[in-house]
A protein has these predicted regions:
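A basic, Ser/Thr-enriched alpha-helical scaffold prevalent
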Residues: 2-628
Length: 628
């Protein structure tokens, strides 16, 4: 037993020799190249002054601290809230929301805090699980109350922002009741915070702004102002620019429930603007571009007086002066622009609101002049770089609405400017200005169609598709027409609507050479290829529109061929290969038209649907057929 007894400290005392003795001992009796085995190097802490204390071992790595681990007494690592939030988010991203809810409810109480519950509530709202999100909110209130915590402002903000994403409130009436309840709970939360700390960061009106957006989507305009007048006039809970912006946006969402139009909303917006100026002077907040743009949109659908007031806001805050003349494009708008009367730099959403004001007030010339003024503005005040595709398409629609000579030429210049601007911009933002099918369709099917301008239509077709219409002209025919291979998204395939417009423009130009050029182009593309679905998930509406324009194109082709046959002259007689091409086209379009007529002549079978009789309450059968 003495052998297994605990040895004393003196037994294992090691006398460390001096450095010179260690060196001699290491070289004697050891072959060359061999190493002496030794224990790992450790350093003792200098803090252990008492000889009875055990020295604290420090590892070599200065980045490792074993005492920094959040461990229990038994050595288990505790679950931290941020790790739990990451796990919950990963489950929700994978569609396992119910599993995430079960994980949170079964997690340790130390890992459950308000931000973790907010994370899961937001994930449920993103997945449109609105009922589950509200149940989590009520459950969180009970669980947090037991531990001395309560939902914070971020909780109410998360709930309101998620509910404001609902578009059809008629099918979510229960969620509207929940929104009212959440707003009342938030106001109680604000009152409790103000009693303890009047300067707390929890005092924010962001949830109220989201609640006002919900009220505007439902059309409860009177309730919006009830909320507005219930707020403080001064302090952190006074109306600010975020809340007032939400109020203007709510007035422009739905018409007034009593009158059924936006005239009363515009008058209310004018009153609200005066309240905005008073609140700005009282609370010292700055009026920004979002606030002014929202006010302009709310005023744009009102009376002429309200619209004139909106144009005054455009001039005061953005420096765009409405033109004086009404007969054409006013060059004075550009000269007035140099006065620098703007106080807010123009942004894309602000310019979109201004163009919407011009459209709603039926003043398309104002939109054209404002666009020209923005092209000459410096970038520091909102120059050409803020213009995107939607702005240009709005100007193209303004060109359609006014009777300006050579509007198709001006429209083509706009599209060419878009393509040049796309090259200048970085690739990350270049797509916002790139013309799409809608842009080219406005130019060809509407603007060029009104003027029957074949030259501009052919140039626009080249820019859109990558073809060269020059290869289909008389005397310039190519057996293999050129097709430019450009980067992805720039070549747009021709559709039946575009080709039908091209055929109508050629016929309207009363030029036989243009008609022949259009027929060669259509024959090369092929009418049958236009009837094929563009993708497997093509909607029924898109399919019906495609067949409609194919039928319209077929009628245009027949009309063009008849013109060429009926009015030919000895000097303008069709060639043999053109005659073969037209015969092929005529046979193809007649087959398409006969097929369409057969579909329209189809008589559907009569189906029966039970209809309840109001007299005796018994269900009877009533014959229903498609109206002729």
């Amino acid at each position: 037993m003495a052998l297994f007894s605990r040895p004393s400290a003196r037994t294992f005392t090691i006398v460390v020799p001096s450095r010179s003795l260690r060196t001699q001992a290491s070289t004697v009796g050891r072959p060359h190249g061999s190493f002496e085995p030794h224990a790992p190097r450790i350093r003792s802490s200098k803090k252990s002054s008492s000889p009875t204390e055990k020295p604290i071992t420090q590892y070599r790595s200065k980045y490792f601290d074993p005492s920094s681990k959040n461990t229990k007494a038994d050595g288990k690592v505790l679950l931290e809230p941020h790790i739990l939030s990451a796990r919950l988010k990963k489950l929700c991203d994978g569609g396992q929301i119910d599993t995430a809810v079960a994980m949170l409810k079964n997690s340790p109480l130390d890992a459950q805090n308000v931000p973790v519950w907010n994370t899961l509530i937001w994930e449920c709202l993103k997945a449109e699980r609105f009922r589950l999100a509200y149940e989590l909110y009520t459950d969180a209130c009970l669980r947090m109350k037991r531990r001395g915590h309560r939902p914070n402002t971020r909780t109410f903000q998360t709930l309101m922002n998620g509910l404001s994403r609902i578009e059809d409130w008629e099918s979510h009436t229960k969620q509207l009741i929940h929104a009212h309840s959440i707003h009342q709970a938030f106001m109680r939360h604000i009152d409790a915070v103000k009693k303890h700390d009047s300067s707390s960061a929890e005092l924010s009106l962001t949830p109220v702004a989201a609640y006002i957006k919900i009220l505007g989507a439902v059309g409860l305009h009177q309730e919006i102002f009830d909320v507005f007048y219930s707020l403080d006039t001064e302090g952190p809970c006074a109306p600010d620019h975020v809340l007032l912006t939400a109020m203007f946006q709510a007035l422009s969402l739905k018409p007034n429930t009593d009158t059924g139009d936006f005239i009363q909303n515009a008058a209310t917006a004018k009153l609200l603007w005066n309240l905005t100026l008073k609140a700005s002077r009282r609370s010292k907040f700055q009026i920004d571009g979002f606030l002014v743009s929202s006010a302009i949109l709310a005023l744009s659908r009102g009376r002429a007086v309200d619209q004139d007031f909106a144009f005054d806001l455009v001039e005061k805050y953005f420096g765009l002066v409405a033109p004086d003349g009404t007969n054409g494009i006013d060059a004075s708008a550009t000269s007035k622009e140099t006065k620098d009367t703007s106080t807010i730099p123009l942004q894309p959403q602000s310019f979109a609101a201004i163009l919407a004001l011009c459209r709603n007030s039926s003043r398309p010339l104002h939109a054209i002049n404002f666009f020209g003024a923005v092209l000459q503005r410096p970038e520091s005040r909102g120059g050409p770089s803020i213009i995107d595709r939607a702005h240009v398409e709005q100007v193209l629609q303004s060109l359609i609405a006014v009777d300006i000579p050579s509007s198709s030429e001006k429209a083509l210049e706009l599209v060419e400017w878009m393509l040049a601007q796309e090259i200048k911009l970085p690739s990350s933002v270049a797509t916002k200005i790139r013309p799409t099918y809608t842009t080219y369709n406005l130019l060809v099917s509407q603007i060029c169609r009104l003027e029957n301008n074949w030259r501009v239509a052919a140039k626009a077709f080249d820019l859109m598709t990558g073809y060269h219409c020059h290869d289909f002209m008389d005397g310039m025919e190519e057996s293999r027409p050129r097709l430019d291979h450009r980067s992805f998204g720039k070549n747009i395939s021709p559709t039946a609507e575009i080709l039908s417009s091209m055929m109508r423009i050629a016929i309207g130009s009363q030029n036989r050479a243009n008609i022949r050029q259009a027929l060669r182009l259509i024959h090369h593309v092929g009418i049958q290829s236009l009837m094929q679905p563009s993708h497997a998930l093509e909607s029924r509406k898109a399919s019906k529109e495609k067949h409609f324009y194919v039928s319209k194109l077929a009628h245009g082709v027949l009309e063009g061929i008849e013109i060429l046959y009926s009015s030919d002259t000895p000097s303008d007689r069709p060639r043999d290969h053109d005659i073969l091409r037209w015969k092929s086209l005529r046979a193809e379009v007649k087959e398409i038209l006969s097929r369409r007529e057969a579909e329209h002549d189809f008589i559907p079978s009569i189906r029966q649907k039970p209809v309840r009789n109001s007299d005796d309450g018994r269900g009877q059968m009533k014959r229903l057929s498609r109206p002729s």
